Structures are given as structure tokens and as C-alpha cells.
Amino acid sequence: MAKKVVALIKLALPAGKANPAPPVGPALGQHGVNIMAFCKEYNARTQDKVGLVIPVEISVFEDRSFTFILKTPPASVLIAKAAGIERGSGNPNKTKVGKITTAQLREIAETKLPDFNTKNVEAAMRIVEGTARNMGVTIAD
């Protein structure tokens, strides 16, 4: 018989840098999960993506064991990295802070495709383009 899931925890952590300090410790500790085991496994699975924020979905079972699924980094993080900016514009309609090419847009959309509710790359590109526009990043052809 399958183990019963007692909690589903969603966190966004820097790749390769999870530690027992907040937010990881309190989120996992209240469900009785071995925090260091999670941190070591998360850091090992994300060591090739250092510098990105990787969302993770942790399933905690009734025997206090856990499994986790790594998601793709947020589109805003990928756009900021491609545009070479630290953060988006505070006023995106007036102040443009960066520029990305259509090729970079397609690459980001293909990276995010598994997490989107579409299987069409063009639709994913439109979703990412909207995020870029809201960050004050323009799309160059």
C-alpha cells in the first residue's frame, strides 16, 4: 500500500545553498522531517544550477519520510539573467531596464515548458514575453 502524504510544502530556495536556517528549518521541522537530510539531497541535486532560485515541492509522508520534486526556475529569474540585470523595473511602463532577443525568449520558454499549462512553444513564449514586459524588459528581434 502507498504511503499516506500528510503535508505538501512548497519552497523556493537558492540552488546548492539550502541550509537548516529559515525558511527551510521551520517549514520542515513542524512536520518532523530530517532537515539535514533534505538540505544535503537538495544541494546535491541542484549543484549544477548554482546562482538560480529553484522551486521545490516536498511531499511529507506519515512515517516522516519525504520526497521532493524540483521545478524550473521562475521566468523572472531566467529573464533577469538573460538581460544581465539584477531586478526588474519599478515602473515597467516608463522605465525599461533591459533587453532580450527573441532567441533568448524562445530558450527561456523551452526551459519553462514543463511547468506551464501548455505544450505549445509559441504560447509559452507569449507567457514569458508578458512576464518580461511586466519587468520592464523589451524584446528585440
UniProtKB/Swiss-Prot annotation:
UniProt-recorded Gene Ontology molecular function terms: large ribosomal subunit rRNA binding; structural constituent of ribosome
Biological processes annotated in GO: translation
NCBIfam families per record: L11_bact
Function: Forms part of the ribosomal stalk which helps the ribosome interact with GTP-bound translation factors.
Protein name: Large ribosomal subunit protein uL11
GO cellular component: cytosolic large ribosomal subunit
UniProt cross-references to InterPro entries, sorted A to Z: Ribosomal_uL11, Ribosomal_uL11_bac-typ, Ribosomal_uL11_C, Ribosomal_uL11_C_sf, Ribosomal_uL11_CS, Ribosomal_uL11_N, Ribosomal_uL11_N_sf
Transmembrane intervals: none
Post-translational modification: One or more lysine residues are methylated.
Keyword list, A-Z: Methylation, Ribonucleoprotein, Ribosomal protein, RNA-binding, rRNA-binding
Organism listed in the record: Synechococcus sp. (strain ATCC 27144 / PCC 6301 / SAUG 1402/1)
Subunit record text: Part of the ribosomal stalk of the 50S ribosomal subunit. Interacts with L10 and the large rRNA to form the base of the stalk. L10 forms an elongated spine to which L12 dimers bind in a sequential fashion forming a multimeric L10(L12)X complex.
Originating gene: rplK
Keyword Ribosomal protein attributed: yes
SMART domains with a match to the protein in the record: RL11
Family the UniProt entry places it in: Belongs to the universal ribosomal protein uL11 family.
